[in-house]
């Protein structure tokens, strides 16, 4: 009898011990699963935060895509319509008189370049009237410029006449991607001296080119404006 009681006590102690071990193991497993879930949650939050810091909001992407540069030649702009020279005279050819000698300054290109004669005309004309005067009165064209040295020479001459801008022979032709600048005397366009923001920036959308007496830079201007001009002959 005592032996049976002793065996029962031993079996109860062993069962209680196993139960504690199983409970501890279960708690340990649950703790590890909880830590793993917490780690995955933290890692996912880190990934989301990183992605949010690097990627702009959809509204920002749309705004960035919609923003354009004013220097882009393909940007929509209000600009002067292209008009052929023969139809742009504001008055009849008979009403256009050749400039008086006292209203002009004649000069020649600098040594080292092809010698040509030039005349700075102080009386203001529209671009095409000026070109007509150059052809009729001097058997030439509005001047084309192919070097910085000659550009500086024209600048100094125009400054001597106390004028702000003068017409030179540059003109914008074509539309859209086919737009390009040409010289009215049909020489190659191999030199330019544009002011900052020109020729595609700023508010000037004319198709004709002026040279500024201050600085010698070029600007686009509406061809119908009246300005002094430079002829070659």
From Swiss-Prot:
Bias (Acidic residues): 58-93
Post-translational modification: Nitrated.
Keywords: Antibiotic, Antimicrobial, Disulfide bond, Immunity, Lectin, Nitration, Signal
Localization, UniProt: Cytoplasmic granule
Signal peptide region: 1-15
Region (Disordered): 24-96
UniProt cross-references to Pfam families, sorted A to Z: Lectin_C (PF00059)
S-S bridge residues: 134-231, 208-223
Biased composition (Low complexity): 42-57
Example GO BP: immune response
One function term, GO molecular function aspect: carbohydrate binding
Biological role stated in the UniProt entry: MBP may play some important roles in the allergic reactions and inflammations, since MBP is capable of releasing histamine from mast cells and damaging the epithelial cells of bronchial tubes. Antiparasitic and antibiotic.
Protein name in UniProt: Eosinophil granule major basic protein 1
Provenance organism: Cavia porcellus
Native organism taxonomy: Eukaryota, Metazoa, Chordata, Craniata, Vertebrata
Gene: MBP1
